[in-house]
Amino acid sequence: YGTLISAALEDTVRVWDLSTGEDVGRLRGHTDTVKCVQVEDELCVSGSLDSTLRVWDLRRVDAFETACRARMEGDGQDVPEADDPCIRTLAGHSRGITALAFDHETLVSGAADKTLRQWDLETSQCVLTMDILWAMSNPSTSVDLRVPPESSAPLLDPLHGANQFAGPFSYPQPPYEDGSWEMYTDFVGSVQFWGFALASGSGDGGVRLWDLRTGQAHRTLLGHTAPITCLQFDDTHLISGSLDKTIRVWDLRSGHVLETLHYDYPVTALQFDSRK
């Protein structure tokens, strides 16, 4: 069946052989809980509360584990550095990383420092920083909060960057009187990108669409009353799940909620297939 990657409340990532159900390797290097992982072919990216991302080459796991066992058995050999599965360490966030999205050309992470970062995997450098609190305090970059009910606010088409329109949204109040969000450790609950469009869900209950070419938040979908924990979107719809016990289906063309699904418990994960 292939390979499975898992993370738990520990600082290692486990590699499983689904054909045998065996734990075949550990990805070691993080110094705090691993909060998110994603695999693309032979590469795995992990994000941790130690504020770093690590890129792993899964093809090196077997040789590295074999060398580790040999050293533990006392043959005196050191593990060659070239066999270490960790091929990149990305540092830049000031607090724990709680969400990531990754393909072979693009990596985006979200962290408790309330920023999103895009990374160059070749240089291990951050090439773009998107500040969620700045977007919240400058709503003209996303939605105009002064728009009357009969009016509409400009939005960004996720595929073509064209201006679309949607009705107004109400802005939620911070949980603390001083305006802070510190009660939400996982302030960024989910991120996903498609082309130049990036969607993020955060602790203020807002879903934002960003343009990766400019780093600007062009669109804000507000309606959830608790932190966003998960989301997924395609060319026409975005679906978000929240600790407010609801799943919302958004029309990306109009910005309106098409359907709200009520659940008995806080929603922590979702996936949809538009083909079914």
Model-assigned labels for residue ranges:
Residues D32-Q38, R95-A101, S137-L159, A166-Y171, ...:
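Canonical WD40 repeat/beta-propeller blade segments in eukaryotic WD-repeat proteins
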Residues L49, R54-E73, E122-L156:
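Internal, charge-rich low-complexity segments
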